[in-house]
Amino acid sequence: NIYGAIPQAGIERADVVYEAPVEGAITRLMGIFEDYDGMEKIGSVRSCREYYVHFAKEFDALYVHYGQAVYACEILNSNIDNISGLSSQEGFGQLYGYAGEETFYRTDDRPSPHNCYTSADRLIEATKKLCYSREYDKDYDGHYQFAGDDQTVTFTDPATHIEPGYEVNEPWFDYNADEGVYYRYQYGDAQIDQLTGDQLKYDNVIFQLCECYPLDDHGYLAIEAEKGGTAYVFTKGTYEKCTWTKDDIESPARYFDEDGNEITINQGKTWVCVVYDTKEDQIVIE
């Protein structure tokens, strides 16, 4: 999600987007797509970080990546359905998830490594080669608690301008009351989809605070995706400060108010910002 990699292609189609910090104080994005049929360009696709695998597992999703940090190799080889652009990792060896070089392609409109893409057809073919199921596991019962078709959720406190506090792209969301959605901005401008030119917009935004710490001198991060903590849930120009918890590392995060009731969010698209639990004071809510 650095400046040279934007705008991304196909991100508008994602039902859920996760944004989390990586080394160098930049962020990377992971889109969760329930319906990706017909998508001819998705990306750019970059390398895996371990915590993104945990977030993907919350949705019983196939995890797609091009390469990985060495710290992610073990989890990728631990019965995780993943599709990778690389077949091995120096210092680790063979990796599962490689379905051939035809799964991804590069364009000439921007320099490497920001020019690697895939498509729905390529991913479907890869799942066939790797014998992955495209159906939900029989025990998966969904992630969020959504409002019913005839319901609209609002909270007590107003939140029409919100910032997660990331240092490099300095993103924010502004609420559009006429449409009932939050519009996304970063690098001082509207964030758009490369294919449509449309600005990204979301029915729900979640700031999820996690313990984060460096793994080495290169700044590779560990993000605790299981311990739980504070979260802020935004919808319809309002917000609730709450607590998030998980039953185990692969189960969905659940959000609860101060009375212990699970938070209900509105139907539609959701953007999740993973924030350092030590940087809560950098969050802006207006």
Label every PLM stretch briefly.
Residues 1-18, 23-286:
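A surface/extracellular/periplasmic glyco- and lipid-processing/surface-interacting theme
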